[in-house]
Structure formats: structure tokens, C-alpha cells
Design a protein with these regions (language model features):
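Metallocofactor- and cofactor-centric catalytic cores in central/energy metabolism, strongly enriched
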Residues: 8-9, 14-18, 26, 33, ...
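Active-site gating loop/helix substructures
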Residues: 138-197
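Structural beta-sheet core signal
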Residues: 17, 40-41, 226, 263
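Electropositive, gly/pro-rich neighborhoods at or near active sites that engage anionic ligands
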Residues: 45-164, 321-324, 328, 335-347
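Glycine-rich beta-strand-to-loop/alpha-helix junction loops that act as flexible
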Residues: 18-22, 196-199
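Conserved phosphate- and dinucleotide-binding cores of soluble alpha/beta proteins
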Residues: 2-11, 29-34, 42-59, 179-180, ...
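C-terminal functional extensions of proteins
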Residues: 2, 239-348
Length: 348
């Protein structure tokens, strides 16, 4: 990472980031430094943990991933941020996040879940917007290469380990839920669309299965970037290369959905690699020729760091590289348009 970026965040690029889980919230923490014109479009297929309990008890969409994104973009007082992140240590609320409960309470007050998210956004004075990809009550079903299937995002890991084969396809039940109109609008108007890092089959792809999302991405004139994970994920993507990730994305959407794939070039210490291997994960191999054969350009940059033995995308480095990709594209477009104008003048 180098150079400088002098554009004020108020005038930064319009960025729509699609995903869920830790990967999306990590990305948002970096992007908010460069633009206020930011929209997070978040999956609602989670059915495990505290989110799953609230979903089952209250019949509401799972709040966890959305709450994490709100926390990442919050500009509230430190005590408020600490409160939203607080998890109850024991009793019937053990493991439950106060932020989840707060959003659940707002959902009971407001006429719709997206309005509840909007209200929580105001309380936390967030940068940009956070939107559920849909307000429909959806479940995720995974089908494996041996024909077995399982319903429920939280059950996929266990079932995949039992079946000992790759995931062939995932789908939403019911199929083709309607996307939130504001999410469609954000994608259509974006300068940059980012498929965030995160769990391939349970955080990223579920968004693409919502009716209208893929079409909106295709229609958009934005720069479209997929940020590939640094490590494979036990229970989802063991043995996957970069091209395997892209094939899965295209299989669940359409070929050529994005222009670029951003991968990590930072070295990972051997001791860290060995520790991850014990947990069934490894660095994702960048099979460049196979990726380019799919019509996707590979960009490798040092966007990951190791902290406390964990490999993570660095929010600032990742956001910087995405903003630079946007700037470079704009320069190319300006040069192209300038060349065309000059040619037209010569011809006349």
C-alpha cells in the first residue's frame, strides 16, 4: 500500500458491498475511511447461534450479520459500541448479543425489518447504509455431489463432514425471494460492486440467489470485484483454488458476473500454515491461468495480515486497493473517451 488518496469521504466512490459474516464487516471497516457513499447488502440465511434463536422465537430475519455490519460502520460513542458488542455470559441469554436484542426490539416497534435496521443505523450514526438483501423468511439448502442434501445454514458444516464430498449447489427455500428495492437501486447506481470475502456457500452465494440481485449487478456499469478468501474453509471449501471459488459463483449466478478477482499476495508464515492445516484449512492456491480462462482478471495485492496466529484481511489495506482499482479504471475510461473525442475531431 502506498501513495495518497486526497478525495474527501463525502465525495468518495459509490460502493455496494455484498456478503455477510466477518468478511463483510472487515471490509466495511476499511471502506468507511475512504467513502461515505457506502451500502452493505447483507445475507439473511443464517439460522444458527443467537441469531437463530431470535429467528425461531420471534419470527424475524436473523440479526447477527446485519448487527456486525452496523457495528463496523458505527460512529457512536465508545460506550454505545461496547454495549452493542456485549454478549451475555450466562443464563438463558448466554452467548446472545445485546446488539441482536436491540435490533429485535426495534423490529417489534417498526413496521418492517428494513425500517428497524434503518432506525438502528440512526442510533449508531453509521457511515453509509446497511440493507438486508431481502426481508423474506428464507432457509438455505445444500446439495452435495453424492446427492445428499440438508436444510439450514447451521447444519451444512456437519453434513458436509459426514458426506465427505463437495457441495454441488445451494438454493434458498422458498426460491427466488424478492430483493429489497433499495438493494437493487444501490447496485444499479454503484461505481464499484464488491463481493466481499467470507463463507462462499453460506455468506456470499445466498445473496446471489435472491431475485433481482444478479440482474442488477449485470445491468450496473460499476467496476465489479470479487475479493477471494485467503484461506480455504473447513466444511465448505476444502481443496478449493481461486478458480474453484469463481466457478461456484458463476454456477449460482451467471458467467462473467464480475470483472476482477482480488487475491492476497502477502506471505503467510509456515507455522501459521501448519496450524491451519490441523483445522482442515490451507492458503488458497491462485491458479491464474484457470481464472483467466474464465474471463476474469486476477489482481494480487498484500491485503492480508496475521494477528494472534489468525490470517485476516487487513481492513485498511483491502479498502485502499479497491479504491485504487476504481481510480485506475476511471483514468482508463477518461483516456479512452479523450482519444475517441480526438479521433472524431480529426475525422470531421
Amino acid at each position: 500500500m502506498g501513495g495518497c488518496y486526497s478525495v474527501a469521504p463525502e465525495h468518495g466512490p459509490r460502493i455496494a458491498a455484498v456478503g455477510g459474516g466477518t468478511g463483510l464487516s472487515t471490509l466495511l471497516r476499511g471502506l468507511k475511511l475512504y467513502t461515505k457513499n457506502l451500502t452493505a447488502i447483507v445475507t439473511v440465511a443464517d439460522d444458527g447461534g443467537g441469531s437463530g434463536r431470535l429467528r425461531q422465537d420471534l419470527g424475524m430475519p436473523p440479526p447477527g450479520d446485519i448487527r456486525s455490519c452496523l457495528e463496523a460502520l458505527a460512529n457512536a460513542e465508545p460506550l454505545m459500541a461496547q454495549l452493542m458488542h456485549y454478549r451475555f455470559p450466562e443464563g438463558t441469554l448466554a452467548g446472545q448479543s445485546f446488539g441482536n436484542l436491540f435490533l429485535a426490539a426495534l423490529n417489534g416497534i417498526m413496521p418492517s425489518f428494513d425500517r428497524a435496521v434503518e432506525s438502528m443505523s440512526q442510533v449508531l450514526a453509521i457511515t453509509g447504509r446497511v440493507l438486508p438483501v431481502t426481508t423474506a423468511d428464507v432457509q438455505l439448502e445444500a446439495t452435495f455431489e453424492n446427492g445428499a442434501s440438508v436444510v439450514g445454514e447451521s447444519h451444512i458444516f456437519r453434513c458436509k463432514k459426514e458426506q465427505d464430498c463437495r457441495i454441488r449447489r445451494v438454493r434458498l427455500i422458498p426460491e427466488h425471494p424478492r430483493a429489497l428495492p433499495a438493494a437493487i437501486e444501490a447496485l444499479e447506481q454503484a461505481d464499484v460492486i464488491v463481493l466481499a470475502p467470507g463463507s462462499l456457500y453460506t455468506s456470499i452465494i445466498p445473496n446471489l440467489l435472491v431475485d433481482g440481485i444478479v440482474d442488477a449487478i449485470r445491468r450496473s456499469r460499476a467496476l465489479k470485484v470479487y475479493v477471494c478468501n485467503v484461506m480455504t474453509q473447513d466444511g465448505e471449501t476444502e481443496g478449493y483454488t481461486v478458480s474453484d471459488h469463481i466457478r461456484a459463483l458463476f454456477k449460482h449466478s451467471c458467467p462473467g458476473l464480475f470483472d476482477l478477482c482480488l487475491t492476497n499476495s502477502s506471505p503467510i508464515p509456515p507455522a501459521v500454515v501448519q496450524r491451519y492445516a490441523l483445522e482442515g484449512a490451507e492458503p488458497i492456491f491462485c491458479d491464474r491461468e484457470a481464472v483467466e480462462a474464465l474471463g476474469v482478471e486476477i489482481i494480487s495485492r498484500p491485503v492480508a495480515t496475521v494477528e494472534n496466529g489468525l490470517v485476516r484481511h487487513n481492513p485498511g489495506h483491502l479498502a485502499w486497493e479497491l479504491v485504487q482499482l476504481h481510480n485506475q479504471r476511471n483514468i482508463r475510461l477518461v483516456c479512452r473517451d479523450s482519444h475517441r473525442t480526438t479521433c472524431n475531431r480529426v475525422e470531421t
